[in-house]
Swiss-Prot record:
Glycosylation sites: 150, 325, 375, 676, 1128, 1142, 1160
Domain SEA intervals: 245-358, 1083-1196
Region annotation (Hyaluronan-binding motif involved in chondroitin sulfate C-binding) ranges: 1266-1274, 1322-1327
Alphabetical list of PROSITE patterns matching this protein: EGF_2, EGF_3, SEA
Protein name, as recorded: Interphotoreceptor matrix proteoglycan 2
Biased composition range(s): Low complexity: 537-546
Disulfide bonds, paired cysteine numbers: 1200-1211, 1205-1222, 1240-1253, 1247-1263, 1265-1278
Keyword set, alphabetical order: Cell projection, Disulfide bond, EGF-like domain, Extracellular matrix, Glycoprotein, Heparin-binding, Membrane, Repeat, Secreted, Signal, Transmembrane, Transmembrane helix
Tissue spec: Expressed in retina.
Amino acid sequence: MFAFLWKISLCLLVLGVITGDPQAVAAEEKQAKDASPTPQLGVWQFASPSLPPELRKLHGIVEAEQVNRHLLRRRKRSILFPSGVKICPDESVEQAIANHLKYFRLRVCQETVWEVFKTFWDRLPEREEYHTWMSLCEEGTMSIFEMGMNFSQSEEHRSLIVKKLSYTKEAMAGSCTDWSCGGTPTPASDADATTLRDAAANVPPPHEVSIESPPGGTSHEIEDADTTINNEIKKEDEIPVRPVTEQMIEFSIVIAGEKYSEELSDPDTAKYQLLSEQFVSQIQNVFEGLPGYKNIHVLEFSSPEEDSGVEVHYAVTFDGEAISNATWDLINLHSNKVEDNSFMGIEDNPTVVYTISDFQDYIAEILQKNALLENTSLTLDPNSLQLINVKEILHPTQEDPSWITEHPTVLEHVEFDDNTFSAERPSADESTVSNTLPFDFTKPDSTLDSEESDDNEIRPRPESLDSEVSLIPEAPLSSEADVTSLPDGLXLADWNQTPALVTAPVIEHDSLDSLEWLSAPDSSDEFEDTGLSDDFLLPSSPSSHLVPEEPPSTDDYTAPLLSAPTVASSSVIETDTKRTVTAEKEVVTQGSPADSSSADSLLHEXVEESPFPLEVHPVEGEXDIYLGDRMIFDDGSGSAFDGSGKGMEPSIWPWDVATLEPVFYPGPDSWLDDDNDSLPFRTEDIPEGLILDYILNSGNKLDDDPSKDENEGVASIKENFLDESEIFVFPETTTQQVPLLQTGEPSSVETSTQMETLSMDDDSFVKPSFVLEPPEDYSFADLPTGEDLFLPHSTGVSVEDTLLTSTVTLGXEDSLLTSTVAFSVEQPEESSVGQEIISEAXEHQNEDRPTVEELFTAGQSNVGEAATVGYLDKSSLETVLTAEPFEVSTDTSTEEQQSLDSSLADRDTGLAIRKPADVWPTDRVLEKTLDQTVQSAVPTAAQVSTAVPSLIHQATALEGFAGQDGTEHDTHVSMSISTILNSYVTITADTVELPSHLPPMTTTVSSSVVTLAKVGDETTRVLDVSVDLDHVSMVSFSPEPSEEAKSMTDSHMELTTHAHSTEMAGVAWPTHEIHNSTPVPSRALVVFFSLRVTNMMFSEDLFNKNSPEYKALEQRFLELLVPYLQSNLTGFQNLEILNFRNGSIVVNSRMKFAKPVPRNVTNAVYMILEDFCNTAYHTMNLAIDKYSLDVESGEQADPCKFQACNEFSECLVNRWSGEAECVCNPGYLSIDGLPCNSICDLQPNFCLNDGKCDISPGQGAICRCRVGENWWYRGEHCEEYVSEPLVVGIAIASVAGFLLVASAVIFFLARTLRDQYTKSDTEDSQGQGDSLSSIENAVKYNPMYESDTTGYSHYYRRYPQLTSYSSTSAETSTDYSSEEIRHIYENSELTKEEIQDRIRIIELYAKDRQFAEFVRQHQMKLL
């Protein structure tokens, strides 16, 4: 009890303390609250001189304002102005004005704080820093300029300036002629000015780069950066941090006053040269004012789509470091026309000096000024100016030449990170790094002398020259035909994508650069004039091989290499696989015998990627290749970017050297002896002939056994190649209509390519049935058209008046056979190529067209092979093929061969498809599809032909043939198709008549070229195919075969070699776009993009598109983005904000264009939006995450990706409009644009009477109603109450009702039936009464006592019904009745019954006419 009282007293005491001094408690709470938001100074603030001492006096003011903020409570929904100011409805006008002023001060202070940190300290403020400086600015304690002064005097700002100045000096390494150094800075112009920050912000920090060199070489190290603080950017005599770069920008513009003609497609014509000079002299004035300008070159003239004027495709070369990298990052991947940018003032976008539109506006403005001043000879259309592409060329530092090696030493690009590409694996056709064998690119002051060619020499090591084939370090260029060079300023971007070709381009004599021909001396003198050797091999990769003339004395050969522009050597994979094949006389080894374990790896479409720096250590006994003075880096894609902001192109193709070695052997005996049902024709139909196969001999090691004789060596090669590899040959053609016989004996090859993945092995090729299996039909293999079949950068070469002549000298055992095959592609005005094709080829050489013959031979005592392939330099790149038909005709002649060298010397047939004098890299692929004409042929012998696509551009690289343990052959054929005439022209060949002692042979035709084109379609596809002979030996593919093509699968037709050309389609490939689109569809008009704003909070109101918050934010982004996009994108029409999503704020938008846009518009939009992110951060306090940018073209994008659909909704795309919308799943609703939510949550009273709401998948919301012992609720919403007694009563009532209804129905039916019976009985009784009364009436009215007329009339009146039953007339009935009645009364002896019977008969007589007729006949018979 005492304890209980003590507790009560204690509670009273505590209550009294609380109620007695509430003010003190409130004061303490208030003090605690006010103390919490006081700004705290960090350590950095006291250490920095930029902090003012006035901060200590602000506590009172800040506390009061914080208290007021905490006490304010908004009761009603505020009014949101478009500017962002929110006004409460109960505020007065003065308060609203004060709120605007307060909001203005807040925005100005925000901008000031962001800008001062970004400008002086180049970083974002921390949270405490931001709040501190914001409070200073809002209270007016410190002005904007005072804040800038404090920041400019801080130590952090000074160290930042020192660091960036040191970077700038090392990066520039030049004079200050193009920069404003010292003195008072002047305002920069829109076109050619930049700031120090722009120039230095993109310069990476210096790196120390070590260059791996073989023994005897030298290595250079980059000196450390000079950290001296100096405002001068002066020339430093030091090695630059990174190689000097050049920018090559390609433009196109239309000359309005000119008319396009065919002469402008030939660079050698006078009109082409005159127009080029006029154009260069006029356009040169535009670019001379730009910093770093070097020269201008005209690439080509073409006819625009509008057929008005002449479109000029030209390239401008700049010094890459003269203009900031940020400028070229914006321009690089953007191709747009000039737009009016007058509304984009510098005050709205102060940080963007070089934008795409500014650069183009500058050029267009000068063109317009020149046109107004009438200082022009050509009328250029500034509105047609279009930027095509940007290439960057790097110049590595000079080094001493190294030796040939299988693994090249690569200069490290200082801006590459080792881990840049570690997160990505290349696809089957992509590599990530592009480094090409060096060539001394054309410079304005370059000359064609030996000093310049020293850098390109490739010298073998002296110790490796242990074979009889001697090599010279340098071959003299004795004639014009020796020179193979590139045009001025040519970057090898195109050659990176084209594999090693069987031929090299030949440029005019006035080209400034050259490539040396390294060859071995030959015993014959015929080759000395040209500087070429029969041991010459095609240039490609470090490992190359040749076949010696005589048996070697040792096991090793060292083959000479030629630096050719067709080499694209990327990261070389070193494998541990030993590949040896026993062969004689055609065996090539590389390095010493001790190093035979290391071999080349055959790269098939994909390259195993090596991240930078690519340091490959030389192997003892091998030769090293030194990469000369340049490395090429294409603009690329993906997430890998180097320091200059340029991604590296994933389109580099490593190729191996391949030589075509004709080998002759008789056909297998099984063809002649066994049953030949598998062949298209019987053996008796096959004339005698030889099988001509080009063995693909590539970078592989073959064991040489000198003990075997020559015949055994040839036999071993023949046996191995026939037994374990598929035969790959090129088709030979003739002008005569002699059938081309296909070999039906397939052979297999077992591949051993060392690769991570080989997608082409699984799905890229399907072997035709007639190669792997012996049916007689020739089916078209369906090929997938994925990204692994696309060539990212291809060059197209048109063909006009070209001649391809191939001389093949064949020899077998004791008899020598020479077969000269000439391919010609002619214009219609020329005569058809007939039997004089070889002489015509010689005439082409005698003209003023420089020609180079590239010879590759493999000679032996009895077996010699030779092939001559050359190039003309007459056509220009991407020249459109004429629409007239051309012919592909051949001529085959046979003669006795006296010697291999004399045969080749007598035949000057080396003309091939022409290469232009000025060839420039381009992203455009030109294709010409040819209509197929099928002509039925009735040959004298059995005929069969295979549609073989015609190649009109040199774009083939053969990766040769390797063996492992003498049994396995690995044959790869890689082909890069730049310009393909998809003409299924049948190549027919004569079967050569041979002496009778030679066995009959057939010609094996194998096509490794796959073309894919749509005839008549505006869009075409170019495939880059690496053909694995384990999967395919012959492929002739058409995506949509015509009727002729389909019929070829069933019957062997012969296609004529006369094809008609159709319209050529040009495809501009993107440089940052992954080629995952199989076709090139019609270009879309819609581009989707999304971006994330990180400094804005998301609210639920932003889901509702009708809410003021949504409309205000939508209007704000439209005002920001639309002018920016209009100024930088051609044809921009409108921008639509699709929605806002949570995640800070994710803005999903869709822009539309007024006309089709280039395929790489997504890259341009990405770069523009990235620049917008930077601008918005600087000027509008919008922190946009650049890494969240997502841009997709409407034709490839998934519209659902940009819809804010949650897990309770499904995105559906309208089939017709392509619009996507979120449709809620059954049981879910979207209210006011909010994400779909459950009906159970949105409608709490969905289920009544305590029912439970549940979502059934696929059915929607259902209610689970309550159930009791003898009651329950039912209905869709549990609205009906049901009890057990009620159910029983309802059941009883239902049964009773049913019985009642049934009884009623039965009663009604019985009543009805009874009535019917009663009625029928009544009718019968009435009928009998009528008959009796009629007799009485007849007796009563006896006509005997009346006159006839009276009697008749009475009788007739008393029986009127008789007339209704009689079918005769009334008179006839009356007569019969009167006669009968008279007869009855005259014979009175009849009884009463008889009289009644007679009366009935009379009635029947009167009623039924048939009965009356029967009675008459009966009476007549009785009479």
